[in-house]
Amino acid sequence: MKALHLTGNTLTLDEVREVVYEQRPVLLDSDARAAVDRARAVIEDVVANDRLAYAVTTGVGKLSDVRIPPAENRTLQLNLMRSHAVGVGDPLSEQVSRAMMLLRANSLCKGWSGVRGLVIDTLCEMLNRGVHPVIPSQGSVGASGDLAPLAHQGLVLIGEGEAFYQGKRVSGAEALRAAGIKPITLEAKETISLINGTQAMLAVGLLAVLDAEILAETADAVGALALDVLQGTDAAFDERIHKARPHSGQIQVAANLRRLLAGSQIHESHKDCARVQDAYSLRCMPQVHGAVRDTIHYCRSVFEVEMNSAVDNPLVFPEPKKVGERSDAPVHGDIISGGNFHGEPVAFALDFLAIALSALAGISERRIERLVNPALSEGLPAFLAPGAGLNSGFMMPQVTAAALVSENKVLSHPASVDSITTSGNKEDFVSMGMTAALKLQRIVQNTRNVMAIEALAAAQALDFKAPLKTTKLLQKVHAAVRAVSPQITEDRILTADFAAAEALIRSGKLAAAARN
């Protein structure tokens, strides 16, 4: 695969996916390197002349009033990296670790952070050679960015900390040595540029968006199958209804449901029944699924801005290069302290996405209830069980779905409405974005499991509808489910079926089955 040139300005979510999951190689773009070098020259000029600049010739946080002499700058870099690596808890996945390295490297490529190109090159080489820092998941309050997670990432660059390499958890020094990467000695400002930013919460958020897009598409396919076997109507998806309330997600879902439900023998068998409208979990799929799609789109837009932003502090703004300027001329510029590390924009989006996916799981669970409840299932066997009574069928899977949905409700409480004071009251309002990200991870997994149960239940219900057939597209959905989970003809342990259906959804294959 062709190497991705990082510029700091053009990274896309699809490129993140390619680097994280498909190991696309990355490197620092040559034009970006020139900008990086120019900003670095400003830092070196400040250090050489011992001028006052936050985090360059001073301590950080509450200790920003302490001057650091140039002779002690390397010690400061090492101390900052070690002292900020205070994470606890289970490590983030290797995929999140890869995303964090990519995002940090891309942000530094903008040329407003003041690091050497060598720092970015080393991050890129770690990505390319599969050195993935072990990053504890807890310990960030989301301002000044994700300090602890990013410090654990930075430790590996200097040959410390731990890394996953070729399936093993080893020391950072051992991982670099095995991969043929030389550890670096950090110079002035480079530690703060590596650890001050939103890349941990953002990495989790970006991967969650990729998962959420698959879930949203899968929800339409599984929901359509549930509606058909429950003898629902597609009248509520009439294009005129949705043009009257033209939210883009709603219009998109309604059109998708019309496409999925066209040509069903099951529908034809009850078209003259007396029921004029369905329950909300069936009738309002465009409004609910559509709102989820709109939320995903909004969160994606926030994250795409963030991943092409400079988010450390202070930022370095070199003077424009003059015509005829000598290559060895000193470069001057402004070093300005600000707050781009603050995770609030990302935290809000993470919380919003959590709420949306919680709703998607909730409506899925309500359809499961209709499939298994003989008072609601339009003639299907109780709990979709062959020989109900002797067999319990889907009685307990609905309970599992209910448990997951209820957990999601608790996890959907916004983390970003909370704050706590840190660093001697210097950092007195924080985003809690990493907490939002970790909750979102759990909600994504719970939602996928709920949808897996709905897919299994809807497939089981369709089996009972034979010889009547659903639409050709929904037959493909059914076939995809049956390829990983056979029909339940008597009670069996369903744990493996749940896992297989969850993996089918996660891979995107179930959504793909319904496309054409």
Swiss-Prot record:
Entries under InterPro entries matching the protein: Aromatic_Lyase (IPR001106), Fumarase/histidase_N (IPR024083), HutH (IPR005921), L-Aspartase-like (IPR008948), Phe/His_NH3-lyase_AS (IPR022313)
EC number(s) from the headed UniProt entry: 4.3.1.3
Alphabetical keyword list: Cytoplasm, Histidine metabolism, Lyase
Pfam families: Lyase_aromatic
Gene3D superfamilies, sorted: Fumarase/aspartase (Central domain), Fumarase/aspartase (N-terminal domain)
Signal sequence segment: none
PTMs per UniProt: Contains an active site 4-methylidene-imidazol-5-one (MIO), which is formed autocatalytically by cyclization and dehydration of residues Ala-Ser-Gly.
An annotated Gene Ontology molecular function: histidine ammonia-lyase activity
UniProt protein name: Histidine ammonia-lyase
A GO CC annotation given for this chain: cytoplasm
Catalytic activity field: L-histidine = trans-urocanate + NH4(+)
PTM sites of type 2,3-didehydroalanine (Ser): S144
Organism of this sequence: Koribacter versatilis (strain Ellin345)
Location within or outside the cell: Cytoplasm
5-imidazolinone (Ala-Gly) crosslink, residue number(s): A143-G145
Family: Belongs to the PAL/histidase family.
NCBIfam families assigned to the protein according to its UniProt record, in alphabetical order: hutH, PRK09367.1
Pathway, per record: Amino-acid degradation; L-histidine degradation into L-glutamate; N-formimidoyl-L-glutamate from L-histidine: step 1/3
Domain of life: Bacteria
